[in-house]
Amino acid sequence: MAALVVLADERGYQSLRVEDLIALAGVARGAFYEQFRGRDDLLLATVTEIGELGLRDAATAYKRGGPAEVRLRAAIEGVIGFAVAQTAAARLWLVDAYGAGPAAIDTAEQGLDGIRALVAQALAELAGEATPDEAPALDGTDAAALSPDAIRALTGAVHRLIASRLRRRHEDELPSLGRPLAAWIASYRPPPTPLRRPRGHATPGTDARIAPRDQAERILLGVCDAIYDKGYTATTLADVAARASTSIRTFYAHYESKEEAFVDAVDLAQVQSYAAVLAASRRAPDWPQAVRAGLTALCNYFAGEPPLAEAVVVEVHAAGEQALRRHEESTAAIGRLLEPGYELAPDTPAIAAEAIGSAIDTLLYDAIRAGGGPKVRAIAPTATYLALFPFIGSTAACEVANDTGQPRRRG
């Protein structure tokens, strides 16, 4: 396990061979296969152990006592402290595992599940719905609490902000994240009335398959279709050519590699989704309604194109640094939609815009992994509520998310 952590940190997980691991660990090939079925099996075992250690640090800090907000901050700082002290291990858990296929993702998520429970407990106490000895329901049966999707989104924001710094080797930025992230999460309260599922269907045309304008876009959509079928790592140029109804020769006339074409596919999704967001938000009568319209348009865009959504939101984590940078630019664009909110609530933590963008990315990611389509459209009210709450409060954010009443300034 130690050899995997070291080599993955040096070379990246996808480039590792069992022979490399055996050589560094100093064990016989037979001894390795007595313990593990292969490299991926070793990854699952290693990520499980790392996740348990990260959760242990968070839970230990949380249980030291104090008010709920103090314990929440301690838990988040515990996870961050683990990432600072065990950078290579944390990178394998919070970054590399998410590009190594569904089993690795599910294993990495198990470590985060315990942290989600701590966040849910603290927020339930802050909302007056639980005591320190009561565990909140995480299945959505507690109508007075934040929904499980909202809890996953808030915790997912913590994960993504840590993972981004780890991936870019900016570990020095991690210690300063704990206090503002905890303050941002601790501010949330449940909506006064349940958030509604979106009414009716998407705007006509939003579920239509994107029509490629030229051969290059046909190839990009073929890339997404092939990745949707097989996953990024397993997809070959022959798969892309078949799904794009073209030849490998034609592919090379436009792109040098699968990696280059995929980055362009991420760019295509970014441009088209942001255009949909802007078009919808500009028609809104005020800023809160613009946020709701924009996020609804974003959800409708990805709901209408499942292969592209799977590729550029989920499989992007397997596609390398350049593609991930482009994806983070898309997430940052959501944050820019929130900038007017700081005029309404100037005391909102500066990190809120980045964190909310990451929370919404988590909602999209989870909904797409769960099947996409209508599940993606269904997250729009939760995304709207999470985006608006820090700036206009629970009542107004709920009214806007449910498309009822008039938004009010936070008082």
Residue ranges of model-derived segments:
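Helix-turn-helix
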Residues: 7-41, 226-260
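Amphipathic alpha-helical packing segments from all-alpha helical-bundle domains
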Residues: 102-138, 145-160, 176-183, 320-362, ...
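Generic hydrophobic, amphipathic alpha-helix propensity
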Residues: 1-4, 21, 46-50, 54, ...
